[in-house]
Structure formats: C-alpha cells, structure tokens
C-alpha cells in the first residue's frame, strides 16, 4: 500500500509552499487508495510551539485534507510528534556508532562558514571533513577542555542515484555533493536527516513529496536507510 506523509515543523504558520506540498502529497496518495500520515517535526523545542502544531491541523481540516493517522489523533505508530520519539533516534545513533560510521566534530559555526569546502550550485556548503581524521587522543583532549562535539556520519565514496517525480533521474557523488553530514548537534538535538529516516522507516512511508529546497536531503536519507 502507498503511504505518504506530511511532516511540517511547527515553528510558525504554514506558508503556501507547505500547503502546496501537503496538497500534492495528499492527492498522490489518495488517488491510489493509500494512507496519509501527519507527523509533527518538533525536535527543536526552542523554536517549535504547540499552538502552531494545533494550527497545522486546523489549516488541513479547513482545506479538507483528512489524514488517516498521526497528529493529535494518534494511530498505530504513535507518537507522531518527533519530540516524543527521541529514544528511537538514540537507538539508531547507537547502531551507527557501533558500525564505526560516526565521528565527533568540534568545528565552530564560524569555522564551518570559513571552510574552503566546495559549494553546491544551490548555495549549500559541503563539510570538508576537518574532524574526520581526529585520533582518540585528539578527541579526548577536546572533551577534557570542555568542548562538546556534534556527531557526523562518515560518508563513503559512493554515488547515489534516485528518481524524482519531477526532475527524473538524479545522481549525486556523496563526498562532494553531500559531505559528512550531521546526525546530532553539539547541543544534543538530533539532526533532521536521522530523525526523518528513522520515522519514515518505522511508519512504512513509501513516498515523499518535498520542496526543491529539500531535494539535497534525499541522497543523505537514502544513504542512512542502508545501515538502519
């Protein structure tokens, strides 16, 4: 069965881009007799607010977009709020660490902005792997000095190809197009890429509709599906 999802972040009122994605996802799923899930991506509790999450549901109802499970209604894969699913992300991160695919990154935001890594055509900066080669002693010294590291995925030298419903076949070379991306921030907040993959897999999502600005997330998420 086709299972799609709409997964907004309740950090403000929905805009036309959000609503357009919701409508396309809903119509795509329902035209094939599938199920539509509403998931609230509220991991960043400093920016996300419960009243915005409630407004999402009100807006969808006003538009006549009825979800089959999720949101405040719950369902078999509850909870549908990412802030309540952190134990699942911890388990996934532990699995990746056990496979040697994770390393700490102590780069500051200023260092990342100043990095001489190549920039994608869409303006995104690819992490240059500054901390990838740190030894256990290097890491211990930084941690002893009170520095908290973020956690990154060690990206292999591989190519990922996927089919986009609008653009057709898209191919990206992971080291230069994605780089070693974040799994958990230095403040302990789980990164979008990890949480989305864990949730989509757990909820049996078979189709994702996203804006062009999030297209670069697709190869990262496909890569994470393999070990998880």
Whereabouts are the PLM-identified features?
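N-terminal Rossmann-like or analogous alpha/beta NTP/dinucleotide-binding catalytic cores
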Residues: 1-120, 212-228
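Active-site cores that bind ATP or allylic diphosphates and position pyrophosphate for catalysis
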Residues: 110-228
């Amino acid at each position: 069965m086709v299972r799609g999802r709409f997964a907004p972040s309740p950090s403000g009122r929905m805009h036309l881009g959000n609503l357009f994605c919701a409508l396309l996802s809903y119509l795509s799923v329902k035209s094939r007799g599938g199920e539509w899930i509403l998931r609230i991506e509220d991991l960043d509790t400093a920016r996300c607010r419960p009243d915005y999450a409630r407004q999402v549901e009100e807006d969808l109802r006003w538009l006549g977009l009825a979800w089959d499970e999720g949101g405040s209604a719950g369902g078999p894969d509850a909870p549908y709020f990412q802030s309540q699913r952190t134990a699942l992300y911890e388990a996934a991160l532990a699995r990746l660490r056990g496979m040697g695919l994770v390393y700490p990154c102590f780069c500051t935001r200023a260092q990342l902005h100043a990095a001489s890594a190549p920039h994608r055509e869409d303006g995104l900066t690819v992490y240059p792997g500054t901390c990838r080669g740190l030894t256990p002693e290097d890491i211990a010294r930084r941690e002893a000095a009170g520095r908290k590291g973020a956690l990154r995925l060690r990206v292999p030298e591989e190519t990922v190809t996927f089919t986009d419903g609008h653009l057709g076949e898209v191919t990206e070379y992971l080291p230069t197009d994605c780089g070693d991306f974040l799994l958990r921030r230095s403040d302990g907040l789980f990164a979008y890429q990890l949480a989305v993959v864990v949730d989509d897999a757990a909820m049996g999502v078979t189709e994702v509709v996203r804006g062009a600005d999030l297209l670069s997330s697709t190869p990262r998420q496909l890569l994470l599906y393999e070990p998880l």
